[in-house]
Amino acid sequence: MGEALKYSIMDSVRSVVFKESENLEGSCTKIEGYDFNKGVNYAELIKSMVSTGFQASNLGDAIAIVNQMLDWRLSHELPTEDCSEEERDVAYRESVTCKIFLGFTSNLVSSGVRDTVRYLVQHRMVDVVVTTAGGIEEDLIKCLAPTYKGDFSLPGASLRSKGLNRIGNLLVPNDNYCKFENWIIPVFDQMYEEQINEKVLWTPSKVIARLGKEINDETSYLYWAYKNRIPVFCPGLTDGSLGDMLYFHSFKKGDPDNPDLNPGLVIDIVGDIRAMNGEAVHAGLRKTGMIILGGGLPKHHVCNANMMRNGADFAVFINTAQEFDGSDSGARPDEAVSWGKIRGGAKTVKVHCDATIAFPILVAETFAAKSKEFSQIRCQV
C-alpha cells in the first residue's frame, strides 16, 4: 500500500470517527449531579435532578411543568379581539388559573400517597379527581382500620389462611372489609330511601360525595373533596369491594327476579360522563393540566375528557408501564397528541418511576412550595 493511499484511508476514517459536532453550549442543559461537598441540602438536591440525566431529569422536567401549571394566569395571554370587557380586565385575567385534573390508581391510595392526595384536595390545589373503585374504598377503609407494611415475597396461600390480603408489599386484614360493609350498607340504605322518596338520581360522583360526607374524617381525601366541592369521578365504581357491597345491597333492597319493577339502588353513569366531559369543555378561558399517576381507567378518562376541548395544555404522567404492548397505561404523551387529547404545543413529560417515590418529591417542589398562594381562593371560571 502506497503512502498516499494509506494517508487517504486514515483521513477518511478520522473524518468518520471524529465527525464535527454541533455546538450545544447554551441550548442544552449540561449534565452534572449534586455536589455533596456543599453539605446536605434537599431542596438543592432535588433541583439538581433536572441536570442528572435519565429519569431524574424527567422528574426534574415534571416539577418544572407542574410549576408552569400553577404559575399560569390568563394575564399571560393577549386578549382576543372578541373577548368581553370583563375578560379584558387586568385583575380578572390575573385571577384565572389553570384547571388541574388529578388521576391516580387504587394502589396509590392503598399506599401512603393517599396522604399526599389528601393534602392537595384539602387545600383545593386540584380541581377534578379521577380514580378507580379501589381509590374510593381504600380511602374509606383506612378511616375504619389501618393497612400494614408486609413484603412482596410473602406466600399467597399462607396469607389467605390468615385472612390477610396482599397489595404489593402492603397487607390489608380481611376484617377491614367486614368493617367497611358494616359502615357502608346503612349509607346505601339511606341513599335508596332518598331515591324512592325524594327521586334522587344518583351518579357515581354523587355517591362518592355522599360517602365523603358520611365518613366525616379529616384523614380522608374524599371528606375534603366533599367539603371543598371538588368532584371525584369513578366510571368503574363497581370494580372492587365497593362493587361487592353494591352487589350485596341489591339483594337487600332490590328484587333480582324482577329488576324492572325494583332494581334496588340505581347509579347513572351517563350523568357522570356528561359532568366529567363538562369539566373540560367548560374550562372556558382556562388552560388545563393533567397529572396522572399510574395508568388504565383514570389515565384514559382524564385524557378523553380533555379531547373534548382539543387537548390539555400541560401533562405529567408518572408510571412504570411500557408502550410496546399498545396499552393506554404505557402510552407516552405524544400518543395522546395524535388523538387530540393533548395539544400539539403542550408541555409534557412522562416519568418512568414508581409514583410512591416520584409524586411526594414532585409535590414538595410544586404545590407544597407554593402553599401560601393556595390560601386565596383559586378562580373557578
From Swiss-Prot:
Record has NAD as a keyword: yes
Species for this entry: Solanum lycopersicum
SUPFAM superfamilies: DHS-like NAD/FAD-binding domain
MF terms (GO), sorted A to Z: deoxyhypusine synthase activity
Gene3D superfamilies: Deoxyhypusine synthase
Disulfide bond positions: none
Protein name in the entry: Deoxyhypusine synthase
Chain positions recorded as NAD(+) binding sites: 106-110, 132-134, 138, 239, 295, 320-321, 354-355
Protein's GO biological process: spermidine metabolic process
Cofactor: NAD(+)
Name of the top EC class for this enzyme: transferase
Reaction(s) catalysed by this chain's protein: [eIF5A protein]-L-lysine + spermidine = [eIF5A protein]-deoxyhypusine + propane-1,3-diamine
Family of the protein in this entry: Belongs to the deoxyhypusine synthase family.
Alphabetized UniProt keyword annotations: Hypusine biosynthesis, NAD, Transferase
Spans through the membrane: none
One of the record's GO cellular component terms: cytoplasm
Annotated EC: 2.5.1.46
Catalytic residues (UniProt): K341 (nucleophile)
Function of the molecule: Catalyzes the NAD-dependent oxidative cleavage of spermidine and the subsequent transfer of the butylamine moiety of spermidine to the epsilon-amino group of a specific lysine residue of the eIF-5A precursor protein to form the intermediate deoxyhypusine residue. Also able to produce homospermidine from putrescine.
Tissues/organs with expression: Expressed in open and senescing flowers, but barely detectable in flower buds. Very low in fruits, until they began to soften. Not detectable in cotyledons after 5 days of germination, but reached a peak by day 15 when the chlorophyll levels began to decline.
Induction (record text): Up-regulated by osmotic stress and chilling.
Residues at which spermidine binds: E137, E138, D244, H300, G326, S327, D328, E335, A336, V337, S338, W339, G340, K341
